[in-house]
């Protein structure tokens, strides 16, 4: 049975732009953290190479709760400035290459096609943070993390229309 998917969550690896971080690195780090290989469905390298790490029908642990059950996780390599420190939020920036930007759109469209018209939201991991003040908007002060280091909601809004 095909699972219901209504959201796509965009992630970054929170790794420095000047350091290569491969799918093998993701697998190693996710094995250590979760006891399983890559918990994203799609992983995109700096050169734009798209890796299908998991079948879209598999629930993976990329965000939390309903975002995992009803979401597809797409991750790009990067998110931290060259020579930056992943522990410093000021070093979290949009490091996407032109190739990654193109591949992200390809991967999102592929995920949407697989879902069969049920996707209603494309957002960043940070946009799944709790709305602590209850105003209906996840604001920067409420972000649990900076990921994906750019504002995914307006970036991909046109894909939902």
For the regions a protein language model found, what residue spans apply to each?
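A short, polar/proline- and glycine-enriched secondary-structure boundary/capping micro-motif
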Residues: 21, 61-69
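Short, conserved "active-site rim" segments that organize catalytic pockets and cofactor/ligand binding
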Residues: 1-58
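Charged, often glycine-rich, active-site loop that binds/positions anionic groups
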Residues: 52-64, 131-140
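Basic/polar, cationic surfaces and motifs that engage anionic cell-wall
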Residues: 1-9, 13, 70, 79-161
């Amino acid at each position: 049975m095909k699972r219901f998917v209504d959201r796509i969550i965009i992630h970054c690896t929170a790794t420095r732009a000047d350091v290569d971080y491969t799918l093998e690195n993701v697998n190693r780090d996710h094995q250590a953290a979760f006891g399983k290989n890559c918990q994203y469905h799609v992983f995109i390298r700096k050169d734009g190479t798209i890796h299908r790490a998991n079948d879209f029908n598999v629930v993976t642990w990329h965000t939390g709760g309903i975002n995992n059950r009803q979401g597809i996780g797409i991750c790009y390599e990067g998110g931290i400035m060259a020579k930056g420190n992943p522990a410093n939020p000021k070093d979290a920036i949009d490091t996407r290459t032109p190739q990654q930007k193109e591949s992200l759109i390809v991967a999102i469209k592929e995920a949407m096609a697989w879902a069969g018209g049920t996707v209603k939201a494309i957002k960043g991991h940070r946009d799944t943070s709790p709305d602590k003040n209850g105003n209906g908007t996840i604001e920067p002060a409420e972000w649990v993390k900076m990921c994906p280091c750019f504002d995914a909601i307006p970036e991909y809004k046109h894909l939902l229309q």
